[in-house]
């Protein structure tokens, strides 16, 4: 692939890691953020120590606070900002951009109040004459591993296969590999909803439960993620892939996962306010829990794990009581996404 110019909106852990992948592939990378001290650190010291204490970035990765300068003559834009500000940043991009580009996003969540997927938000806010079909970049990927060039395999999903293939070529190299998919709904819902299950899996660990329980929450969590996704129009097969069960495993079993760590702290009795203050990063699973719970209620989809986590986070239900309420639910058969 010829050298491309890519704007990465969001200098967090994942935005930084993906910037390095793109730079390794010979592309011009411009990171945009709104914290001058962080942008200055990236440009002066080539570090982003809030997220990666021991990583030195290539000096060709340049960071900006000026959005117009960031977007000038770019070929593609990658959104990697928190879910709650995606719409605002998209509006700013729409007001600034003056040519058509490939639009990608690598964030995982649902908009808190509207329950909308992020590709829907980008489609609503960025006019068609300025963008391609949206491409979702998602899958089992800890930034802490990608930044040190550990093997990572994820998915590029778009309604337009050729656009997904462009993104596949843009990112893929000897340590980072993308597969294409056209099921945008499935890939996005899998990426968003697995954060909820990761909170639950972490809570089980914090409470001292063993591997049996942790395996069960991943398997049954995948079942209810699939139920909601299918109700929204996704293919059930997507949830057996990298962006589905793959992402759920990596997020629901690892200390690298901020959602897992948040659940672990909840299980050990810490308050949600203290957890959010100590984490120093956005915990998407918290806001996504409310959005998914309300969406499931609206669509009549059975999601007992999500409901239990919602009750714990937003209504102060005792975690162990919530767990044993699930254990005492009506007996059911198990099938494809029962």
Curated annotation (Swiss-Prot):
Active site: 194 (proton acceptor)
Pathway(s) annotated for this protein in UniProt: Membrane lipid metabolism; glycerophospholipid metabolism
Catalytic activity: sn-glycerol 3-phosphate + NAD(+) = dihydroxyacetone phosphate + NADH + H(+); sn-glycerol 3-phosphate + NADP(+) = dihydroxyacetone phosphate + NADPH + H(+)
A GO term, aspect molecular function: NAD binding
A Pfam family it matches: NAD_Gly3P_dh_C
GO CC annotations, alphabetized: cytosol
Compartments it resides in: Cytoplasm
E.C. no: 1.1.1.94
Residues forming coiled coils: none
Listed transmembrane segments: none
Function noted in UniProt: Catalyzes the reduction of the glycolytic intermediate dihydroxyacetone phosphate (DHAP) to sn-glycerol 3-phosphate (G3P), the key precursor for phospholipid synthesis.
UniProt record similarity statement: Belongs to the NAD-dependent glycerol-3-phosphate dehydrogenase family.
PANTHER family: GLYCEROL-3-PHOSPHATE DEHYDROGENASE, GLYCEROL-3-PHOSPHATE DEHYDROGENASE [NAD(+)] 2, CHLOROPLASTIC
Entry protein name: Glycerol-3-phosphate dehydrogenase [NAD(P)+]
